[in-house]
């Protein structure tokens, strides 16, 4: 039996995000998101969440201005997920993610003389359909699976 209170809470949370923060948020029927799932969406972000999305436990999804996140149908995220999007992340249908997975389509600019900069470089990430990503995997900018 589904925890219907949590499903209702997620519907309210996602609709408030769409109304006040991210007008380009498209949500199909989300199955279950952990109550500690945190969405930080900038105003011009484009986010599409597919049908039957399930996320256990806590996680964080950050989508910057003019960035795009697409998550297909029947995707499962285990706990301690982190997705940071400054360009584009696309996740296909039927994907499964183990605990502790991190997805970053961006990185700080770094050089030996000046160290770490506040600037970022980014490149799209594409994860195809029916992929299984094991525990504690880190997926970086420009990756195609």
Please provide the spans of the model-predicted regions.
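A short acidic, helix-capping loop that chelates divalent metal ions and anchors anionic groups
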Residues: 112-114
